[in-house]
Amino acid sequence: MNKFLNLVMRYITADQIFSGKGFFPSHTVLVLDDMNTISDITTLDSIEKSNVEHFKGIITPGFINTHCHLELSHLKNVIKQHTGIVDFGLSVIKNRNNQSPEAQLEAMRQADREMREQGIVAVGDISNTNVSIEAKKQSDLFYHTFVELIALNPERADLVFDVGKRLLSEFSKAQLSASLAPHAPYSASLELIKKISEDCSTLNKPTSIHNQESNAENDFFNSKSGDYLRLYDTINVPIDYFKATGKSSLQAIISSFNSKINTLLVHNTFTNKDDIENAQKTHSHLYWCLCPNANLYIENTLPDIALLHSTNCQLTIGTDSLASNSQLSIIDEINIILKYQLTISVELLLQAATYNGAQFLGIENKFGLIEKNRNSGINLIEGTSGNYSVKKLA
């Protein structure tokens, strides 16, 4: 019997235990203290079996949601599905201030509680304003906020960057982790991307960008054609200065990022092999975020996840916002992938949902792994492949 056995400790095991990088040997037991820190990792034969809680399913570290928009939580069930990205974006612009500040804050608090209940422990969250600060300060979750900037006109890069830095300082004053991020290739000039990326490099913080969420984005960069012309016409923003590049959006913008900082490419729904290979040659710290529920909600299609995996992309998982999703649940995103892309393994997706996400956010020393002397959250996944559910054990 383990000589350290006492009533304060909790001993848990399951059919499988996933560390964040792979599965532990069978009969592994996690020893938790009264603060849910892992004080030891041992085996069944070293413990009095009557003291061990045995669960059916898979134990994992707490999940990392690398892409969310908490400040859009009040738009749940407001925007129609399958409209395409341009009409979705126009609907967000039209409706994002349709509720009182108090109602928006309560929606954010509810979304935060939902994520916690779904086993999420850390979030990479997009913010265009300061409205999420209060909800984040009160949360048990770790948030890294990406203060998102928009300006396709290169002449506006300095002004928008300065406004972004002032907003960034509000999060910093609230003692919330944050850095700048460009919105998307079609809405951020190369000049703005460069300024943001260099600022993140100076601060040693990650950045993020929505990437190839629609094929219209590639049309816009390749030949200055497609649905984004309608977007800019509708919002009455002239884009005479923008010139076609003859390239996909990703190939046109990737060299503007500092290749030494962690950079998240979000969605990648219309990313092909040439795009991936070009990006990987150019940038050595790329992560590729999957948000399948949002992809189905907006464009009704999914990225080629098998291609991303076969080309050694570092995958992470995000929920996107409640404007484009019915719930903020990493396990539900995993279920969607397992249902539609049968060659993808559970192990790959669990690493994407835990260690990879933590590594991207630069919090892998605290989150994303089951290791001795850590308190990274403990989840239990129950059910069968494609129909999993999750509950928090610690």
Predicted regions and their residues:
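Alpha-helical scaffold segments that flank or form the walls of functional sites
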Residues: 31, 58-59, 76-140, 162-173
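Hydrophobic faces of well-ordered beta-strands that scaffold small-molecule active sites
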Residues: 64-66, 123-124, 143-147, 178-182, ...
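Histidine-centered catalytic micro-motifs
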Residues: 61-73, 206-215
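N-terminal metal-binding scaffold of metallo-dependent hydrolase/deaminase domains
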Residues: 1-47, 58, 363
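Active-site glycine- and acidic-residue-rich loops that bind
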Residues: 125, 181-195, 211, 267-270, ...
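Active-site gating/metal-coordination segments in enzymes
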Residues: 163-206
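His/Asp/Glu-enriched, well-ordered alpha-helical/loop segment
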Residues: 229, 256-258, 291-292, 301-383
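Active-site gating loops and adjacent loop-to-helix segments of metal-dependent hydrolytic enzymes
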Residues: 74-106, 140, 144-147, 215-260, ...
